[in-house]
């Protein structure tokens, strides 16, 4: 199991933010954001992120699928007080049809694609 208890506690805070960092072919980082409330976790621990924007992230993932994601909440006890987060590393791919897209689109009609994130690690940050 890669996704730890702190991760699951953080995403219960529906107002918490999610940041997705990707790298372009020019080597420059790009950050895109969404909300915890939109994440869907599959039984095999894939994280599904509904997308309407995320165009640059999608373009970056075509050539460099390795991304990092940060989730956080100020309502979860951290190592030094209230507030903590998790840094996740793994790979991303985008789909605009298929079973995982349909799962997301059935719940969130604005999604015209889904970012499918496969985590390789999940570490508490603070």
Task: Put a short name on every predicted segment.
Residues 1-126:
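Binding-site signature for planar aromatic cofactors or substrates
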């Amino acid at each position: 199991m890669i996704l730890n208890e702190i991760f699951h506690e953080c995403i219960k805070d529906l107002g918490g933010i999610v940041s997705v960092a990707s790298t372009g072919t020019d080597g420059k980082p790009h950050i895109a954001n969404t909300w915890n409330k939109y994440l869907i976790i599959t039984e095999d621990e894939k994280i599904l992120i509904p997308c309407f924007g995320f165009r640059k992230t999608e373009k970056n993932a075509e050539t460099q699928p390795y991304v990092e994601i940060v989730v956080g909440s100020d309502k979860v006890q951290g190592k030094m007080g209230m507030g903590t987060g998790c840094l996740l590393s793994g790979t991303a791919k985008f789909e605009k049809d298929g079973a995982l897209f349909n799962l997301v689109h059935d719940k969130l009609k604005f999604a015209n694609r889904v970012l499918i994130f496969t985590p390789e690690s999940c570490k508490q940050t603070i």
